[in-house]
Amino acid sequence: MKEIISRHKAGEQIGICSVCSAHPLVIESALRFDLNSGNKVLIEATSNQVNQFGGYTGMKPADFRDFVYGIAQEVGFPRERLILGGDHLGPNCWQNEPAAAAMEKSVELIKAYVAAGFSKIHLDASMSCADDPTPLDPMVVARRAAVLCKAAEETANEEQKCHLTYVIGTEVPVPGGEASTIGSVHVTREVDAARTLETHQIAFRESGLEEALSRVIAIVVQPGVEFDHTQIIHYQPQAAQALSAWIKETPMVYEAHSTDYQTRQAYRALVRDHYAILKVGPALTFALREAIFALAQMENELISPEQRSRVLEVIDEVMLNEPGYWKKYYRPTWSQAMVDIHFSLSDRIRYYWPHPRIRQSVEKLIANLNNVTLPLGLISQFMPVQFERLSEGVLTPTPHNLIIDKIQDVLRAYRFGCTPDVA
């Protein structure tokens, strides 16, 4: 990470896409995408996804590391080009507890991530706990971040400290996605970004963390990009001009969250304007969902009814029977909720792919299509971009390859933004 930031600060139009997903096919797609490029790949876990209690994936930080390393080994991707990050590490999961208890758990969370070899750590203590006022005083946020930083510094060995980096600050949306429709997005004011940096500098120095300050590489801000279930707010460079100018005077860059679904040109403009770390998550699993849905349509054309996976029906049954991950986010009317379940840009379906019934039906779908030849016309009908790549000779038409390449469509847009010589 430090090398990428140094090159950006030296004037190079370079950034990095942060892959925020625990889905094995998404991780495989990212590693295969940069297998021969020489680029580093940044894969991040969030605190609610992976923590010392298992998170919603059931994985502790060391488990997630081993999970990613296992995929890297299968792909042949060298570990030294892998960067593991932890996102929103702090009291996020324990906001309903008193601050003292939540911070104790947050310290253990940080220790678990650093001990497991995660080298990019987002120190986020911005959320109010059960006995806190709302919003929290910025100095309280910074002092709590310093407590977390101290835990990281005490856990890391000397070799780890060579690679250890911190990200501070937070964006407006809560981690995990918008629960309501967005009308507009407030771009972070440069005075607020400056205050974030200043309060953290004071708090770190109070705690004797002068050396750790040199490891702070980025500040999370809102540059004016967001999406909800049905709409996207696209980057408007002129609205973020003052914010973009301020960071030039510091040794840091910005980290932008919720950059999913922006255009290729927007990613290039964001990196140019010093939002050099671009986080993406739902857009990757949305592409995965599109691929599964497309393959299901092909299956309907090629496989007899009694042999089909029924994957789309199984997804509906599971999500309607177990609505915990989508109910409070999607519209209450039945017909509208079904559209959201299938096609919402926030892609709450991503929480259901590990479900045993859904996983088995996806496996059957792929097995069914592996046993037949996929006609080019059928691929053109349901996956036209992949058909073009087949025609160019850069893709072979297996179900697995089609899924991977569909996910990589998203990564191609980020590469355009993050790599100066990509046309």
Swiss-Prot record:
Pathway as given in its UniProt record: Carbohydrate metabolism; D-tagatose 6-phosphate degradation; D-glyceraldehyde 3-phosphate and glycerone phosphate from D-tagatose 6-phosphate: step 2/2
Superkingdom field: Bacteria
Keywords on record: Galactitol metabolism
Keyword Transmembrane helix on entry: no
Any single GO BP term: galactitol metabolic process
Keyword Cell membrane: no
Record's GO cellular component terms: plasma membrane
Entries under InterPro entries matching the protein: Aldolase_TIM, GatZ/KbaZ-like, GatZ_KbaZ_carbometab, TagBP_ald_GatZ
Pfam families listed in its UniProt record: GatZ_KbaZ-like (PF08013)
General function of this protein: Component of the tagatose-1,6-bisphosphate aldolase GatYZ that is required for full activity and stability of the Y subunit. Could have a chaperone-like function for the proper and stable folding of GatY. When expressed alone, GatZ does not show any aldolase activity. Is involved in the catabolism of galactitol.
Protein family according to the UniProt entry: Belongs to the GatZ/KbaZ family. GatZ subfamily.
Subunit and interaction comment: Forms a complex with GatY.
Protein name: D-tagatose-1,6-bisphosphate aldolase subunit GatZ
Encoding gene (name): gatZ
